[in-house]
């Protein structure tokens, strides 16, 4: 069975559906309106939008949030000393989410490809991400590796502080001990 997918730039009109899908996939408290507005703004630079959504008919089936280089905060989970390019040239691949029923068809890779092209137009020469190693079948790391990503460093308990502040991990609930793979 062949389906027609409609890829387009993320806009504020998509926020409610993005939050709904993010909650289903990543857990309660992962994303709200305030965070969504902030994440969206960080993806805009020089009139170029690095965020994308994909619809099947009227159903949102995936989205990619990417922060433009120099429009995101380096934190303790960023091993900048290990990065092969200057920090100011690095975009941040914040979130790539695909509805469970639509996984395995290249949607995540296509969303990443589109964000990479936009980030390059914005001036980035590389992108970094923290991938959820406990994703089903470690699919997050597998897809990013397939798309050319390399491991920079593993970070145990990456989302622990957030879980204590209200984020509900789909695996650990409110005491998350999942590990992130920092990849570029």
Task: Identify the residue ranges that each predicted region occupies.
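Conserved beta-strand-loop-alpha-helix junction that forms the acyl-donor binding cleft
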Residues: 103, 129-141, 157-162
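A short beta-loop-alpha structural element at the N-terminal edge
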Residues: 4-20
């Amino acid at each position: 069975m062949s389906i027609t997918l409609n890829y387009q730039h993320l806009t504020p009109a998509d926020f409610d559906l993005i939050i709904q899908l993010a909650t289903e996939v990543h857990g309660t408290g992962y994303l709200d309106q305030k965070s969504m507005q902030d994440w969206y703004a960080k993806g805009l630079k020089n009139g170029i939008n690095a965020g994308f959504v994909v619809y099947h008919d009227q159903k949102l089936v995936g989205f990619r949030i990417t922060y433009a280089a120099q429009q995101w905060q380096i934190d303790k989970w960023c091993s900048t000393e290990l990065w092969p390019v200057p920090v100011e040239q690095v975009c941040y691949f914040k979130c790539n989410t695909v509805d469970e029923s639509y996984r395995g068809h290249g949607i995540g890779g296509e969303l990443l490809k589109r964000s990479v092209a936009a980030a390059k137009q914005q001036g980035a020469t590389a992108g970094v991400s923290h991938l959820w190693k406990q994703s089903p079948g470690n699919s997050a790391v597998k897809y990013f590796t397939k798309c050319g990503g390399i491991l920079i460093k593993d970070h145990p308990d990456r989302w622990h502080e957030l879980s204590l502040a209200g984020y509900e991990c789909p695996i650990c609930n409110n005491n998350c001990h999942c590990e992130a793979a920092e990849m570029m």
